[in-house]
Amino acid sequence: MLMPKRTKYRRPHRVSFEGKAKGKNVIVNGNYALVAKEGAFITNKQIEACRIAMNRYMKRTGKVWINIFPHLSLTKKPLEVRMGSGKGSPEEWVAVVKTGKVLFEVKDTSNSEKVEMEALRLASHKLPIKTKIVKKGVQV
């Protein structure tokens, strides 16, 4: 699973995913990309599920770039525990995704647009947010 090797603080403040993405909103590597239409926290398991789905469909003919990484830890207190007594232990790692951020980029060596678009469509079903598939050169 994806998670940082080391962090400065174990339990950081929660970050807002409101507003538009400031960085990584341009397609750099691939021909097609999956772009977020809304903001959310995306967990390391969801990112991994997308990666597996795309790689399985494209087999060895394509390359996938993942532009998000789960840097933020979300904490949770155990069930049936009273309020207070600290924040709770880190439960999962999430990536903060804002509107317009390029999540995944795909390039197929056989230059088959169908394969690239289908791989991104399969990945979009694994995510909890609305996304759109964008071609390189088109405004995100």
Curated annotation (Swiss-Prot):
GO terms for biological process: translation. It comes from the Bacteria. The keyword tRNA-binding applies. One of its GO terms (molecular function) is rRNA binding. Keywords: Ribonucleoprotein, Ribosomal protein, RNA-binding, rRNA-binding, tRNA-binding. InterPro entries: Ribosomal_uL16 (IPR047873), Ribosomal_uL16_bact-type (IPR000114), Ribosomal_uL16_CS (IPR020798), Ribosomal_uL16_dom (IPR016180), Ribosomal_uL16_sf (IPR036920). One of its GO terms (cellular component) is cytosolic large ribosomal subunit. PROSITE patterns: RIBOSOMAL_L16_1, RIBOSOMAL_L16_2. Binds 23S rRNA and is also seen to make contacts with the A and possibly P site tRNAs. Part of the 50S ribosomal subunit. Belongs to the universal ribosomal protein uL16 family. This is Large ribosomal subunit protein uL16.
